[in-house]
Amino acid sequence: MAKEFSRTRRIGQQLQQELAVVLQRDMKDPRIGFVTVNDVDVSRDLSYAKVFVTFFEEDKDVVQEKLNALIAAAPYIRTLVAGRMKLRVMPEIRFVYDSSLVEGMRMSNLVSQVINSDKAKQQQFGSVDDDVIENDIEESDDTEGKV
């Protein structure tokens, strides 16, 4: 039976916190810029850590350049984090761009556009009266009882 808070999950959470601090304070590479560590998935044997990151930029080319800079700096980042954590073996860090935040924002914008479009159509053509809706409901109830 799996524990609620497994060791790999606790190490992943600590690694996420330490990576955020290292990337914010210790990394001076201007190519990386502002980066957010969303999640860290550590393998069961603690040999690999998949780090999900997002950037302030939305342009795909700029995001890819920043991700490549992080991948190139991964060994250096690993040594900085290893000095801050008490582990016998520090996991190999693999950076992965997390597009879920961008996709969530895109979906939210689409929903907002549809809502605004519906409101505009409602104002343009007028709203349906509540009496008409109630009459339709009553008529459908009457026909269901007669069947």
Curated annotation (Swiss-Prot):
InterPro entries cross-referenced by the UniProt entry: KH_dom-like_a/b (IPR015946), RbfA (IPR000238), RbfA_dom_sf (IPR023799), Ribosome-bd_factorA_CS (IPR020053)
Region (Disordered): 122-147
Cytoplasm among keywords: yes
Job of this protein: One of several proteins that assist in the late maturation steps of the functional core of the 30S ribosomal subunit. Associates with free 30S ribosomal subunits (but not with 30S subunits that are part of 70S ribosomes or polysomes). Required for efficient processing of 16S rRNA. May interact with the 5'-terminal helix region of 16S rRNA.
Keywords (A to Z) from UniProt: Cytoplasm, Ribosome biogenesis
Protein name as annotated: Ribosome-binding factor A
Single GO molecular function: ribosomal small subunit binding
Subunit annotation: Monomer. Binds 30S ribosomal subunits, but not 50S ribosomal subunits or 70S ribosomes.
Subcellular location: Cytoplasm
Disulfide bonds: none
GO CC terms: cytosol
Family membership noted in the UniProt record: Belongs to the RbfA family.
Residues spanning the membrane: none
HAMAP family xrefs: RbfA
BP terms from Gene Ontology: maturation of SSU-rRNA; ribosome biogenesis
Organism: Shewanella oneidensis (strain ATCC 700550 / JCM 31522 / CIP 106686 / LMG 19005 / NCIMB 14063 / MR-1)
Biological classification of the source: Bacteria, Pseudomonadati, Pseudomonadota, Gammaproteobacteria, Alteromonadales
Residue spans of biased composition, Acidic residues class: 128-147
